[in-house]
């Protein structure tokens, strides 16, 4: 298992196969990501590498974080994430990782935060039918109806579908096929859609259920 990469969702486009078939793709700017630290099974109890993405002003970081980057001899980064790996010794602190590690026709898992919708009612959030439009209905047209029983159990059950904040949740889409790789600009195109809005942060790993391309 090798390290994934941190990136930004650039938006969606389309590509055409040799036989003229059109496929929707999502463009992702991956890296360059610098290896800031390594975690080993002997010292930390697990194997991983810590990657930094997008350079940041040192003044915007705490003294502790600046010291961490100075120790690794890496310019300060805005985003810091860890990826589990099989062999951390195959990575060097300060090494730059780019999109060229992914190959066309390989499969990846993409993790991102879904588009936030704000406070939403039960009809939009959960697809409830709502109340009656007429025939005695009074201000219950988009209501969720009853939320429980009476004195027994005397409470609302956990995970009851109700109105609330919709979206802005971490989700992973698995087994997306890599349709194109631009090693120079460190951009990949994956078939289909991925979570998040344009410009949102995403994590791209080798597909867990398809096996690594190593």
From Swiss-Prot:
What is known about its processing and modification? Answer: Methylated by PrmB.
Query: One cellular component GO annotation, for this chain's record?
Result: cytosolic large ribosomal subunit
GO terms for biological process?
A: translation
Report if keyword Lyase is assigned.
no
List the keywords (alphabetical).
Methylation, Ribonucleoprotein, Ribosomal protein, RNA-binding, rRNA-binding
- Family per UniProt? Belongs to the universal ribosomal protein uL3 family.
Q: What does this protein do?
A: One of the primary rRNA binding proteins, it binds directly near the 3'-end of the 23S rRNA, where it nucleates assembly of the 50S subunit.
Assembly and interaction partners: Part of the 50S ribosomal subunit. Forms a cluster with proteins L14 and L19.
| Protein name per Swiss-Prot or TrEMBL | Large ribosomal subunit protein uL3
Q: Record the organism.
A: Magnetococcus marinus (strain ATCC BAA-1437 / JCM 17883 / MC-1)
């Amino acid at each position: 298992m090798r390290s994934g990469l941190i990136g930004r969702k650039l938006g969606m486009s389309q590509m055409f196969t040799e036989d003229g078939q059109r496929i929707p793709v999502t463009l992702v700017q991956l890296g360059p990501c610098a290896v800031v630290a390594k975690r080993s099974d002997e010292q930390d109890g697990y194997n991983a590498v810590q990657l930094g993405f997008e350079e940041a002003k040192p003044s915007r970081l705490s003294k502790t974080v600046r010291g961490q980057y100075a120790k690794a001899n890496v310019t300060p980064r805005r985003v810091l994430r860890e990826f589990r790996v099989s062999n951390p010794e195959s990575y060097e602190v300060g090494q730059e990782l780019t999109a060229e590690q992914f190959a066309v026709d390989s499969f990846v898992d993409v993790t991102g935060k879904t588009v936030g919708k704000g406070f939403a009612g039960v009809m939009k959030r959960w697809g409830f039918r709502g109340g009656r439009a007429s025939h005695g209905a009074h201000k219950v047209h988009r209501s969720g109806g009853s939320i429980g029983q009476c004195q027994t159990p005397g409470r609302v059950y956990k995970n009851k579908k109700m109105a609330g904040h919709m979206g802005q949740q971490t989700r992973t889409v698995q087994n997306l096929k890599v349709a194109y790789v631009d090693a120079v600009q460190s951009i990949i195109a994956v078939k289909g859609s991925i979570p998040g809005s344009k410009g949102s942060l995403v994590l791209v790993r080798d597909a867990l259920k398809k096996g690594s391309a190593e």
